[in-house]
Regions:
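Class I SAM-dependent transferase core
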Residues: 30-87, 93
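Helix-to-beta-strand junctions that scaffold the AdoMet/dcAdoMet cofactor pocket
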Residues: 89, 112-113, 171-172, 185-187
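Class I SAM-dependent methyltransferase SAM/SAH-binding core
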Residues: 95-151
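A short acidic, Gly/Pro-enriched loop at the edge of an enzyme's catalytic core
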Residues: 150-161
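A short SAM/SAH-binding and catalytic strip from SAM-dependent methyltransferases
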Residues: 160-174
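A short glycine-rich, Lys/Arg-flanked "PGG" loop and its adjoining helix->strand segment in the class I
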Residues: 175-190
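Conserved class I S-adenosyl-L-methionine
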Residues: 192-217
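Core SAM-dependent methyltransferase catalytic element
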Residues: 228-229, 233-246
């Protein structure tokens, strides 16, 4: 009987590769969540991660850019009223967090000709859309910024206003992002949080993509920002204003 002498070597090599490429128990397991988060079974539209009793929703992503830019959005959401109530000054520096396709970014840029708008998003594809628009519109005061799930990548104490429109509920790390927003705001600066009203069953949006005023204030107040007021000016959304103490 002929024996292939190379076979034992091949088998040994294969075995060693299997052994040394297997993940160890420590690397195979995910790092435990910080105490302020809880992991539970996920619902259809959530990620199974909870913050202050709220399940965090899945992210819409760049495939939803068309919905953000839909022709009927202004009439449905009265985005014109939203922008008017920001009461911006021409030299304000604004951070549009979760900027998406830049729907608000470029509208804001027109109102702050001596200021700047930081369009922050974690999606390179969304930022690609914004960069293309910036060139087309020659919006020199728009700065696209690639953020992370925990950082804005904006200098501390540098912006007068942070705007988040229907984005906060998707943040996978809301506490860390809230802390980052606090750091980015100048003393006296404001955060305007826009979220679909959880309290209104007639708002035709999935549950996890809505937030109640009470829950929103609870979460944002944990950052050190102070709730100032909630304006009842939009047909479907809360317009909540927070400020950073001087």
């Amino acid at each position: 009987m002929h024996v292939n002498k190379a076979l034992p070597v091949f088998l040994l090599s294969t075995l060693l590769n299997l052994v040394f490429n297997l993940p160890t128990n420590s690397s195979a397991k995910e790092a435990p969540l910080p105490a302020h988060y809880q992991q539970k079974e996920s619902s259809r539209d959530g990620i199974g991660k909870f913050y202050m009793g709220r399940e965090i929703s899945k992210v819409m992503g760049h495939l939803g850019a068309g919905w953000l830019e839909r022709s009927g959005r202004e009439a449905e959401e009265r985005t014109d009223i939203l922008i008017e109530n920001l009461k911006l000054k021409p030299d304000d520096k604004i951070a549009d967090i979760g900027a998406g396709s830049g729907y608000f970014t470029f509208r804001l840029a027109k109102l702050v000709p001596q200021g700047e708008v930081y369009a922050v998003d974690i999606s390179p594809q969304m930022l690609g859309i914004i960069k293309a628009k910036k060139g087309k519109l020659k919006a020199e005061n728009v700065t696209p910024v690639l953020g992370t799930t925990t950082e804005l990548n904006i200098e501390d104490n540098s912006v007068d206003c942070v705007l988040m429109v229907d984005a906060y509920h998707e943040f996978s790390h809301p506490k860390e992002m809230g802390d980052a927003i606090y750091r980015a705001l100048k003393p006296g600066g404001k955060l305007v949080l826009i979220e679909y009203r959880m309290e209104d069953p007639l708002v035709p949006i999935k549950k996890l993509h809505k937030m109640s005023e009470k829950q929103s204030i609870r979460e944002i107040s944990a950052t050190g920002l102070v709730w100032e007021e909630t304006l009842s000016v939009l047909p479907q959304q809360h317009f909540m204003v927070f400020s950073k103490p001087n």
